[in-house]
Curated annotation (Swiss-Prot):
The lineage of its organism: Bacteria, Pseudomonadati, Pseudomonadota, Gammaproteobacteria, Moraxellales. CDD domains: RF3, RF3_II, RF3_III. Increases the formation of ribosomal termination complexes and stimulates activities of RF-1 and RF-2. It binds guanine nucleotides and has strong preference for UGA stop codons. It may interact directly with the ribosome. The stimulation of RF-1 and RF-2 is significantly reduced by GTP and GDP, but not by GMP. Its main location: cytoplasm. GO terms for cellular component: cytosol. It comes from Psychrobacter arcticus (strain DSM 17307 / VKM B-2377 / 273-4). GTP binds at residues 22-29, 90-94, 144-147. This is Peptide chain release factor 3.
Length: 531
């Protein structure tokens, strides 16, 4: 399809695609809500705490998430802000869903890291930062919960620098905290932004004043606290380096803002910083070449599959990140892995669970494709060119359970359910070659609960899981057919096929795995598999 290069460049420059990363309970879902409020994508803020009402947080749309108050699946939300188009990918904050989160981070151009001001850098944040590091993702930092007692801001900054190995450049500095939270002082604007309590559900423009030294602020904080604020501010100003955009884009430096997501204070500053500094859609690597966002032919890759987004339509949606060109309704695309041309007439755009038919989409946008079992995570779609996007892995699960069906007559429904749920990539199914068992592998215990809950709710299948003596799994590759055949004969009892039909070795112990690797050096035992 003919695309006007000028218009394409303009649309690419307007896009900002980012994800929020944080430890559970750092306020990520609340932040998502408030960002949507500023983007005027929602009128009523359904705060997460309102569990007794029907107004659950917009981005937690699966019933189990609403019961538990944790984000399990990655939602995608698009909203306008200051003549830009913002695509926000909400990632699961719960530790068990790291694989889904990892793949989401392959589809964004920057990330917002949220730190709980009372707790500082937590373990989950460290893990997610490692993923961002691998891709040099630019990071904006937000220290949350200033309306409560938090740790000393200087101490928090040193911890972020020491633990996450990233240079911090404060953009704002807090004046007081908890009951005495006055607001923030903007270091480059030399202005104080005042916090007003009880305005969390509204878009309010804060009162601002030049500088920070005012009698009412001194009175509110008291002499001791005001002196402590001035002292910390002086230290920050003395040590403050200039903000270096190149260092930020390389993921080596992070601008830091302070505020409260619940109180909707500092959220618009996050959006302003995102628009000002974060990069528009970047080039993406493929096995064949690098694809620039401004190329006029369409290309994109699938980073996530979600079954049953709408229980009313038993459907599966493949989430595709547009990498280049323009999607237009009804266009013909090549599904590269299958070598087939498909006409995409009904792609979707999202506001967490609300789906709207899409007329056009540009690089950086996330679109939903209806999937009837033919699309897999990692698949590329192009206007004909043979391109395979790289860097979207499957990880070896760490926990395994045998699936026991309560009603043997439902084995077909069970297989279908497990197959579809494993296509989403949070769990993996293995079929041992010596029996008819179904083995489920996951990164964390919570995933087994989620699968059982969803099989019951969405597929009307009840099952239980029992422990199985598998320590880990490895994908098997071997170019030497004779050596592979010999290995298959000897290891037959431990071999299985995964959901995609790939040969895997189910190791009963780490020692056994090491022995097999030593015994068969020509066989590759891989702990990840690219999609």
């Amino acid at each position: 399809m003919s695309v006007d290069p000028k218009k394409l460049n303009k649309e690419v420059a307007k896009r900002r695609t980012f994800a929020i990363i944080s430890h559970p309970d750092a306020g990520k879902t609340t932040m998502t809500e408030k960002l949507l409020l500023w983007g005027q994508a929602i009128q009523v803020v359904g705060e997460v705490k309102g569990r007794k009402t029907d107004r659950h947080a917009t981005s937690d749309w699966m019933s189990m998430e609403q019961e538990r108050g944790i984000s399990i699946t990655t939602s995608v939300m698009q909203f306008p802000y200051q003549e830009h188009v913002v695509n926000l990918l909400d990632t699961p904050g719960h530790a068990d869903f790291s694989e889904d989160t990892y793949r989401t981070l392959t589809a964004v151009d920057s990330a917002l890291m949220m730190v709980d001001g009372a707790k500082g850098v937590e373990e989950r944040t460290i893990k997610l930062m490692e993923v961002c590091r691998m891709r040099d993702t630019p990071i904006i930092s937000f220290v949350n919960k200033l309306d409560r007692q938090i740790r000393e801001p200087l101490e928090l900054l040193s911890e972020i620098e020491a633990v996450l190995k990233i240079k911090c450049i404060p953009i704002t500095w807090p004046i007081g905290m908890g009951q005495d939270f006055v607001g923030v002082y903007h270091l480059t604007e030399n202005k104080t932004y005042f916090y007003e309590k009880g305005r969390g559900g509204e878009m309010t423009v804060s009162e601002t004043r030049e500088g920070y030294d005012y009698p009412d602020i001194r009175e509110r904080l008291g002499a001791l606290m005001f002196a402590s604020f001035e002292e910390s501010l002086e230290l920050v100003q003395m040590a403050l380096e200039d903000f270096d955009v190149d260092e930020f884009l390389a993921g080596e430096m992070t601008p830091v803002l302070f505020g409260t997501a619940l109180g909707n204070f500092g959220v618009n500053m996050v959006l302003d910083t995102l628009i000002k500094y974060s990069p528009p859609p970047k080039a993406h690597p493929t096995n064949e070449r690098e694809v620039a966002a401004t190329e006029t032919t369409f290309s994109g890759f699938v980073f996530k599959i979600q079954a049953n987004m709408d229980p009313r339509h038993r459907d599966r949606i493949a989430f595709l990140r547009v990498c280049s060109g323009k999607y237009e309704k009804g266009m013909k695309l090549k599904h590269v892995r299958l070598g087939k041309d498909v006409r995409i007439a009904d792609a979707l755009t999202f506001l967490a669970g609300d789906r709207a038919a899409l007329e056009e989409a540009y690089p950086g946008d996330i679109i939903g494709l209806h999937n009837h079992g033919t699309i897999s995570i990692g698949d590329s779609f192009t206007e004909g060119e043979e391109l395979n996007f790289t860097g979207i892995p499957h990880f070896a699960p760490e926990l395994f359970r045998r699936v026991i069906l309560k009603d043997p007559l439902k084995s077909k429904a069970l297989q279908k359910g497990l197959q579809q749920l494993s296509e989403e990539g949070a769990t993996q199914v293995f079929m041992p070659q010596i029996n008819n068992d179904l083995i489920l592998g996951a990164v964390g215990v919570l995933q087994f609960e989620v699968v059982a809950h969803r099989l019951k709710e969405e597929y009307k299948v009840q099952c239980i899981f029992e422990p199985v003596s598998i320590a880990t799994v490895r994908w098997i590759h071997c170019d030497d057919e004779v050596a592979l055949a010999k290995f298959k004969r000897k290891a037959h009892d431990q071999l299985s096929l995964d959901g995609g039909g790939h040969l895997t070795y189910l190791a009963p112990s780490r020692v056994n795995l090491q022995l097999m690797q030593d015994r068969y050096p020509e066989v590759t035992f891989s702990n990840t598999r690219e999609h």
